[in-house]
Amino acid sequence: DKSDTTNAVVQAKPLCFNQLWDMYPHTTLEASGLAVGLPEGQMGNSEVGHLNLGSGRIVYQDLTRITKDVESGEFYNRPVMKELYEVAKKQSLHLIGLVSDGNVHCSLDHIKAVIKGAHDNGIEHVYVHALLDGRDVAPQCAQGYLKDLETYMADLNCGKIATVSGRYYAMDRDNRWDRVELAYNAIVHGQGEIATSACEAVQQSYDKDAADEFVLPTVIDAAGTIKDGDAVIFCNFRPDRGRELTKALVLPDFDGFKREPLSIYMATMTKYEDGLP
């Protein structure tokens, strides 16, 4: 639409592009929502675009498939989830995930679904290791999502936030292991910044002019660290930024930084990589 004042290409008035448009057959593509296998109204992203273009057809995304599974109840019947809850009954359940409604890497609704399953299975010790966004959503909006999650858990009387960490640390994808190590140490060893609540941890970061993605790994509840025998689920459905922390938690020959191997049951929302849960 050449009258679209929000379209940068239109506003640039590119002579060559406009000539091609006027002289040759052309069409347009939808890049969001149901047209690319996402929920209605959900924006697309690079991974979604590449997958649909390369496939030449609509590919229903992990976000959509998992959401449908949750709505139908099939989510809780999957063997991995059943095993996760069975192991957690003996000790503790830990959820790691990006707490926002950006829906690019993780869905807050999926995190809530796992917590509801824990409640329905009578699991007493449920801890959330909240990763903060600030990239797929506004730079400083984490407190709203954290309060929403805390309210949900309080209503169920199930779960508490044990640690928070900006995605800059916990969701690195370029082998910058010094960042991942900080997140790992908070989640496993209870080492890092200290705060009495998740929102306080975020505010401490804001006071230092650091937005959500740069919140230093912070311990809220030292009793909520991952220990041998615990059950862990990484709730991110997009693999690329979940791999490194997962490797640190489960690979026996991990060499990104020094740490003692854990004996845990770990699941991930999707297959991150061959050799990982």
Task: Map each language-model feature to its residues.
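Active-site nucleophile/metal-coordination loop of metallo-enzymes that catalyze phosphate/sulfate
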Residues: 2-168, 178, 182, 254-277
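Flexible, charged surface loops at secondary-structure boundaries
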Residues: 88-89, 226-228
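Conserved phosphate/oxyanion-binding catalytic-loop motifs
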Residues: 238
